[in-house]
């Protein structure tokens, strides 16, 4: 009998598709010591059908598309300011809801836990807007989306590339023209446990409960975004990309999921989703006349279905063609290669497992010397004779 889905847990993306795939409901998702969700198999319920492993999307090669590349932003400036980039997701979602469909995306739920939820009307979309720099639990949403699609109800499912692949794995051979999938260029997903621990630290510091957290606040502009926590007592905690500890740690790859560092699900124009969204970084050089610092999206229409969905939202979009894909990859390297783990990742988690998130410790880790700098320091402190011997060896 199985105890887990994959022999190599480092490959598991935590999409949760196996929970829906299992015919005996023998799988649940449980957090590990780093705070990431992994499948746990109930050996007494398992019938060794191996469906979970056979349909697991981890490590699979993605189909290559000749995507149509666009720059785009919603004409509605207020919507752009509420969105991480240009507001394209909301326009796509509104169209699906208008047709009687359901939109799935990441939102804050109970106890500030990030999870995938379903929106049945436009008022429920607000919680899905904006980036969530923490891995969302999509387990239930995948199962619910599959059920809706079997009833021929339109569904827009947005998420990381691995979550989109999880949904498609759960659907199996069931193909539906009612499904529209939207992923994004993913930097990697941080630990839900680490984020929860950080919120606990903030609440102790402010003596109040966190009511809201924004990862991409645009008060200082789209490019110079900041993170803002809002508390029940009316106080706010805000910081920039290099001063807000959790945001800084995420951007420095300090606590991303292990599978993110060998991700096979986001490579150039290889995507499983109909549409891929990203920030149009470098807009000030690519299209300076359109860059008002309220947000611009880079859009990849990967399939005919994706192109049609964008055309249906066309009246509400300012869009233009982008022909230089290579230029986009220079501004956003995650389009091509997964990020490398921070060299102090292991040191962070070793202490985190005993003490939880410690902002001062995180900033010290990230601002301290790296391996190259430490090596140079050791060399500079060598005796003069040793320095001469090293120099002589190099010159030979």
Regions found by a protein language model. Name each.
Residues 1-2, 44-151, 325-345, 350-358:
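Flanking helices and flexible, charged tails adjoining ferredoxin-like Fe-S electron-transfer domains
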Residues 2-13, 41-47, 152-155, 242-260, ...:
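Immediate flanking context of iron-sulfur cluster ligation sites
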Residues 4-5, 11, 17-40, 50-67, ...:
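Iron-sulfur cluster-binding cysteine motifs and their immediate structural context
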Residues 10-25, 45-59, 160-166, 256-269:
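Local cysteine-cluster metal-coordination motifs and their immediate loop/turn environment
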Residues 84-87, 110, 157-167, 188-190:
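Gly/Ser/Thr-rich loops at beta-strand to alpha-helix junctions
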Residues 99-102, 203, 208-396:
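Long, compositionally biased charged/polar accessory segments in the mid-to-C-terminal portions
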Residues 132-181:
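Conserved nucleotide-cofactor-binding alpha/beta core module
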Residues 179-201:
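Short, flexible loop segments at boundaries between secondary-structure elements
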């Amino acid at each position: 009998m199985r105890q887990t889905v994959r022999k190599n847990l480092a490959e598991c993306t935590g999409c949760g598709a196996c929970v829906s795939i299992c015919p005996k409901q023998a799988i649940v998702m449980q957090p590990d010591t780093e705070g990431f969700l992994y499948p746990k198999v109930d050996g007494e319920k398992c019938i060794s059908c191996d469906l979970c492993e056979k349909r697991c999307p981890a490590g699979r090669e993605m189909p290559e598309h000749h995507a149509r590349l666009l720059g785009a932003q919603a004409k509605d400036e207020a919507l752009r300011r509420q969105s991480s980039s240009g507001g394209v997701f909301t326009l796509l979602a509104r169209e699906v809801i208008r047709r009687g469909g359901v939109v799935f995306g990441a939102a804050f739920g109970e106890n500030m836990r990030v999870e995938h939820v379903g929106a049945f009307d436009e008022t429920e979309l607000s919680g899905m807007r904006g980036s969530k720099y923490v891995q969302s639990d999509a387990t239930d949403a995948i199962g619910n989306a599959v059920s809706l699609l079997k009833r021929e109800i339109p569904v827009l499912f947005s998420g990381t590339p691995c979550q989109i692949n999880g949904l498609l794995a759960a659907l199996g051979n069931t193909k539906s023209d009612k499904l529209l999938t939207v992923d994004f260029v993913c930097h990697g997903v941080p630990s839900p446990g680490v984020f929860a621990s950080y919120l606990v630290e903030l609440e102790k510091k402010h003596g109040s409960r966190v009511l809201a957290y924004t990862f991409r606040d645009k008060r200082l502009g789209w490019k110079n975004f900041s993170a803002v926590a809002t508390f029940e007592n009316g106080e706010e905690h805000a910081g920039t990309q290099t001063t807000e500890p959790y945001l800084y740690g995420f951007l420095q790859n300090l606590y991303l999921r292990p599978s993110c560092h060998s991700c096979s699900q986001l490579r150039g124009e290889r995507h499983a989703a109909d549409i891929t969204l990203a920030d149009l970084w470098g807009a000030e050089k690519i299209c300076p006349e359109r860059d008002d610092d309220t947000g611009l999206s880079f859009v990849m229409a990967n399939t005919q279905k994706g192109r049609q969905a964008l055309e249906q939202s066309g009246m509400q979009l300012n869009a233009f063609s982008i022909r230089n894909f290579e230029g986009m990859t220079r501004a956003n390297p995650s389009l091509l290669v997964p990020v490398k783990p921070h060299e102090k990742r292991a040191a962070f988690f070793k202490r985190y497992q005993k003490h939880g998130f410690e902002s001062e410790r995180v900033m010290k880790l990230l601002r301290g010397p790296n391996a190259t700098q430490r090596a140079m320091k050791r060399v500079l402190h060598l005796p003069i004779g040793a320095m001469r011997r090293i120099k002589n060896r190099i010159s030979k």
